[in-house]
């Protein structure tokens, strides 16, 4: 049966579509920049591509599914569950990509001489594959049984088979709040965020120690190296900060829902928290453009070559740029 869309839902859909229209092209641009620019081919940028792929999927898949769920169509229980799980997969993928980036930056400043022999392209690819495998396992856990099926069945005719079980599809109807808080947040979101915080604190401490060493004629190169590392570390720490700022409010609301069932959370706060989580997928390309010179150079090359119909003869020399 067709369901009318309220004015509030129309506003929600409009904002979600706007986020998707910024997120998808922006992150495709990030992937494109890494593909065309040799200076963006090290391990860090491979992990950034993995993060960008997850963000593209948020705009192209999760946001449309979120709009459908917000309308609340009548669907079979597991069909609704399948629409709710992708956001869990992609959130975990983003967290693990950010963790891989943090570990990579730590190794760059901790063992700069041996870094390239330790962090090889093959090992980076294996790490990315492992991140995605873990993300699917964590995000699909509700499909394996940790969901609200038994709770919903308790309110219905027990003689009805699961395949005939039709519900109004909403995220909180099918996803267990115990799963969201105890497993998703307390195990797979909060600990990695705290670990990344400690890693970046150590990265900044190592860089500060190196930069505070007495500069001599023989130490110009190390000073320059660590100065560049400091700039990129600050930019990637900003990406982490924005991710935490975007996702923690929704997880805090989930904790309130679980631990204080009688507490009434205003719907507007829930929607703002959802907008923050989805909007985070559009933030990273903006950070890269303004904070990382390699990306800024690559973005300008793409713009000049493909959108301004200019043949930038100097692009080949810029491509070989190795500024870190």
Curated annotation (Swiss-Prot):
The keyword Transmembrane helix is assigned to this record: yes
Keywords of the record: Cell membrane, Disulfide bond, G-protein coupled receptor, Glycoprotein, Lipoprotein, Membrane, Palmitate, Receptor, Transducer, Transmembrane, Transmembrane helix
Domain of life, source organism: Eukaryota
Cystine pairs: 80-169
Signal peptide positions (record): none
PROSITE patterns documented for this protein: G_PROTEIN_RECEP_F1_1, G_PROTEIN_RECEP_F1_2
GO BP terms, alphabetized: G protein-coupled receptor signaling pathway
Transmembrane segments: 11-33, 47-69, 81-102, 124-146, 177-201, 236-259, 268-292
Lipidation (S-palmitoyl cysteine): 309
Membrane topology: Multi-pass membrane protein
Glycosylation sites: 159
GO cellular component, one term: plasma membrane
Compartment annotation: Cell membrane
Topology Extracellular: residue spans: 1-10, 70-80, 147-176, 260-267
Any one GO molecular function term: G protein-coupled adenosine receptor activity
InterPro entries the UniProt entry points to: Adeno_A1_rcpt, Adenosn_rcpt, GPCR_Rhodpsn, GPCR_Rhodpsn_7TM
Residues on Cytoplasmic side: 34-46, 103-123, 202-235, 293-324
Family statement drawn from the similarity comment of this UniProt entry: Belongs to the G-protein coupled receptor 1 family.
Known role: Receptor for adenosine. The activity of this receptor is mediated by G proteins which inhibit adenylyl cyclase.
Stored PANTHER family: ADENOSINE RECEPTOR A1, OLFACTORY RECEPTOR AND ADENOSINE RECEPTOR
The name this protein goes by in its record: Adenosine receptor A1
Organism, as annotated: Gallus gallus (Chicken)
């Amino acid at each position: 049966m067709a369901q009318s869309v309220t004015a509030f839902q129309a506003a929600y859909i409009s904002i979600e579509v706007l986020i998707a229209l910024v997120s998808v092209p922006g992150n495709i641009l990030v992937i494109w920049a890494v593909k065309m620019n040799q200076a963006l081919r090290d391990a860090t940028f491979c992990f950034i591509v993995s993060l960008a792929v997850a963000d593209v999927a948020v705009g192209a898949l999760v946001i449309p599914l979120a709009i459908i769920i917000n309308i609340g169509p009548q669907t079979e229980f597991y069909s609704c569950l399948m629409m709710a799980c992708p956001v869990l997969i992609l959130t975990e993928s983003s967290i693990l990509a950010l963790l891989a980036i943090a570990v990579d930056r730590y190794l760059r400043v901790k063992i700069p001489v041996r870094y390239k022999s330790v962090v090889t392209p093959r090992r980076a690819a294996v790490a990315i594959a492992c991140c995605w495998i873990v993300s699917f396992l964590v995000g699909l856990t509700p499909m394996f049984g940790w969901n609200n099926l038994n709770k919903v069945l308790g309110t219905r005719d027990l003689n009805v088979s699961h395949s005939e079980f039709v519900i109004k599809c909403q995220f909180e109807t099918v996803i267990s709040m115990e799963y969201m808080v105890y497993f998703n947040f307390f195990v797979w979101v909060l600990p990695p965020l705290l670990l990344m915080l400690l890693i970046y604190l150590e990265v900044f401490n190592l860089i500060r120690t190196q930069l505070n060493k007495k500069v001599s004629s023989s130490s110009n190169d190390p000073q320059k190296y660590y100065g560049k590392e400091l700039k990129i570390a600050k930019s990637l720490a900003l990406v982490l900060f924005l991710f935490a700022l975007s996702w923690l409010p929704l997880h805090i609301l989930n904790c309130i829902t679980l631990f204080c069932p009688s507490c009434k959370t205003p719907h507007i706060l829930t929607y703002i928290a959802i907008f923050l989580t989805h909007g985070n997928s559009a933030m990273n390309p903006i950070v890269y453009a303004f904070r990382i010179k390699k990306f800024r150079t690559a973005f300008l090359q793409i713009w000049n070559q493909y959108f301004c119909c200019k043949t930038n003869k100097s692009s080949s020399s810029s491509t070989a740029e190795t500024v870190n």
